[in-house]
Amino acid sequence: TEKTFETIDRMPKYKGQLYNWYSTHTLKPYEPLFVSTVDNGNLLCSLWTLKEGCREMIAQPVFRSVAWQAIADHVDVLAELIAAEPESEELTAAIYDLKQRLEMLACGANDTFEAFATLEVDTAIFLEKLADSPAGNEIRWWAGELECRVKRSIASIADFAPWLRPEYSAVRDQLGSRVPRVSGLRLENSSKTYASMESAIRQLASHSDAPDALRSATRLLSDLERSAGIAQDLRDRLNRVADAAESLADDMDFSMFFDDKREMLAIGYDAGAGCISKWHYDLLPSEARSAAFGGIAQGSIPQKTWFQLGRFHGMQNRKPLLYSWSGTMFEYLMPCLWTKPHRNSLLERGARAAIRVQRKFAEEKGGIPWGVSECACNEYTQDGHYLYHAFGVPKLALHRDEYSNDVVIAPYATFLAMMLEPAAAVRNMENMKALGWLGTYGFYDAADFTDRRIGRGKQHEIVRTWMAHHQGMTFVAIANVLCDSAMQRRFHADSRVAAAERVLHEVPPRAIPAWEREIVAAFRPADSDSATDAAKPAA
């Protein structure tokens, strides 16, 4: 993160905003000098989240019980891989023994040095058995990472809580209740903790004549001084990253994207021509709402911008939905990586409706996995890259193009949906995995079910590539699901976000006005279901 900010500092900007394209060799922006509204909006939300995340790390315990759960999850992955190997009985028994030992240590250890040291020995025994086995590279990689993880845990304890090392057991026994609890050690109070420990050790040493005890006390005092320096350095680095994120976000001027006449955000700004683009973002279910919300929270654009974003409602199977431009999962759920989908709000119900329609779409296509969104497909551009397009579900989309009838499933869409429908999403992931869509770096970018792009006799073609932004969205969604809405919580911890949050609580309308039905009908003239049912209450 520090190196990323160092690079960003060297990149030319326009009114604090990053250009759309840069040379990775020179960091000079490419022509045309275009500044993207949505990309900078996503960056703004990410910067605020990062800032609060750094401050949260300073305030939270250095050692947490989730460390044991993380190692247990790691061992579970190893066990699953070993179970899939032929003739793996010996390794299966070895990993089972390791799991049993881990459970025993986690129950009674409270993250002590001794517990991790014991786990290190147990891991080494497992690695010895693995070395003599015909296990594949993937198992060996995960096993190597387990060893590194345990060693890093031991190093962290030595760095931040040196009194837990076995050579200081006699000092600990003599100090008794004055030994700090590791669960209470935080970077924000580490100086006080180390000073208190130092005072207790000096007092102990002043009442002892035993040479061994004095030597141990002297060494521990030296280690405490080192620990205080490490903690101070880490605290300072986290604060510097938080400050860098805040500074970069503060420099971003979103008023440059605002069209005063239409009271909307333009697609972007042409810095070469010195004007905003002629196209605008005018739909609420879109990536643009992150930029709109961020600009409103920042105070650089008026709140009315939010209410200028279109909300076009319809009905499918007698249930309400909110139309997007392309019908992608991305349009409904990507902003939820940061913003909370408040229960029964317009955005929450619109997102759930989109998931429902997407699942129904996959069911109608023969029960294939669901999750349609912008992604690569099994077609190549002139320069040999996979074609990228905003694939969507027709029943959710206002817009239709030559790709509207294509069926391309993007696994990252399921991870986005997991934030609202976790059980259904996990079942879908299991189906995708069973079909062979999981590769070395996670799920492949897409699976293409479009007839003209698949080989004879095949049901689909896997698009064997990974895209950084889809992987990033996947990781953030996982963090929200597994870590108590971590990214959403951090984003909303910013005072500006909290002040603007009320727009996210907007409720669905009780009925759809006639003018809105006319607009929808103009885009979707053949959709008789929507045309007939749209006049009914949406709530």
Regions found by a protein language model. Name each.
Residues 1-539:
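Acidic, mature catalytic/reactive cores of soluble proteins
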